[in-house]
């Protein structure tokens, strides 16, 4: 699939339903393989409330910042950062919503297009990512993107996760500027 059919943009109100559908209509086993503790999931309305809040906040105020991924102008996934320390660092997440679009290398291309938004708008010096160590796809993507593997350890990486082994990856602004995406 050519990169000409791929684009990215900041989240809009029209994205809240399909993004929520991804989380609330996905197979529970898929979510567990990603490291989600289903008992920690907020309600759909609470989830939508968090997304709506993000839309009304300045970059400096955001607790999460989401970029929507489009294939032929249709939303097919997203990436967001959270655990944001504005002007310093944030933690990256990446999600392709439909299983038909997974394992095609789209995530790699989309993240390359997304990273400038995070570095520029959040004024970041470093982006970290801590995928579930037993989920190979995002770990392979981080390596291919030029993120540096720092360590593997056990933690609860997010508010909807169970305790799990994660791989901690980092990409500094300096290294990002050197990469020729």
What are these regions (language model features)?
Residues 53-67, 77:
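A short helix-loop-beta-strand connector motif used in the catalytic cores of GNAT acetyltransferases and
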Residues 23:
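Residues forming the ATP-binding cleft of Hanks-type serine/threonine protein kinase domains
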Residues 29-53:
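Conserved GNAT-fold acetyl-CoA-binding loop/helix
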Residues 1-18, 28-29, 66-181:
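Acyl-donor (CoA/ACP) binding surface of acyl/acetyltransferases
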Residues 35-36, 63, 158:
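Sparse recognition of residues in long alpha-helices and their boundaries
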């Amino acid at each position: 699939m050519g990169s000409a059919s791929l684009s990215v943009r900041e989240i809009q109100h029209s994205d809240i339903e399909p993004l929520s559908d991804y989380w609330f209509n996905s197979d529970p086993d898929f979510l567990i393989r990603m490291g989600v503790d289903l008992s920690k999931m907020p309600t759909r309305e609470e989830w939508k409330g968090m997304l709506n809040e993000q839309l009304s906040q300045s970059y400096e105020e955001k607790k999460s910042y989401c970029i929507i991924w489009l294939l032929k102008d249709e939303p097919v996934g997203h990436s967001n950062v959270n655990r944001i320390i504005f002007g310093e660092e944030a933690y990256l997440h990446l999600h392709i919503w439909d299983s038909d679009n997974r394992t095609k290398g789209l995530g790699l291309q989309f993240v390359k297009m997304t990273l400038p938004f995070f570095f520029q708008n959040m004024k970041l010096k470093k982006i970290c990512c801590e995928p579930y160590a037993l989920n190979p796809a995002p770990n392979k993507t981080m390596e291919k993107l030029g993120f540096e593997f720092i360590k593997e350890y056990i933690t609860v990486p997010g508010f909807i996760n169970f305790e799990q082994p994660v791989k901690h990856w980092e990409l500094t602004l300096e290294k990002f500027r050197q990469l020729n995406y």
